């Protein structure tokens, strides 16, 4: 994998070797240099700059379309999940209301039993 070297490292390499040395196939790099980096770079454990890659408008449109399709699928899944969560929320709310009614009924029954108990106590004490 090719990585960019800093301008400082490049200038240090030029000073050490005394010349700019390239050979082999011509490749264009992001910093405008051309050539395959050779012995000097390996000697000083430097890595050549990353090659610049260009894409055509058609390739970009294909990439954009595929991304849009992927995003649409994700949006649809999210919409379905939101609907499911809303349904569950409504069910939980309904269950909560039912529990409230049950608790109120139990409270009323408890109050009635307390009143009956007081009456029984009064009758027994007579």
Swiss-Prot record:
Signal sequence coordinates: none
Protein name according to UniProt: UPF0134 protein MPN_504
SS bond partners: none
Family: Belongs to the UPF0134 family.
């Amino acid at each position: 994998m090719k990585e960019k070297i800093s301008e400082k490292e490049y200038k240090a390499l030029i000073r050490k070797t005394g010349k700019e040395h390239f050979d082999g196939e011509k490749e264009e790099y992001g910093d405008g240099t051309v050539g395959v980096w050779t012995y000097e770079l390996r000697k000083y454990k430097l890595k050549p700059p990353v090659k610049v890659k260009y894409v055509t408008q058609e390739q970009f449109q294909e990439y954009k379309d595929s991304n849009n399709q992927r995003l649409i699928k994700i949006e649809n899944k999210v919409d379905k999940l939101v609907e499911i969560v809303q349904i569950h929320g409504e069910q939980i709310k309904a269950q909560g209301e039912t529990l409230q009614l049950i608790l109120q009924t139990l409270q009323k029954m408890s109050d009635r039993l307390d009143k009956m108990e007081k009456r029984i106590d009064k009758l027994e004490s007579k």
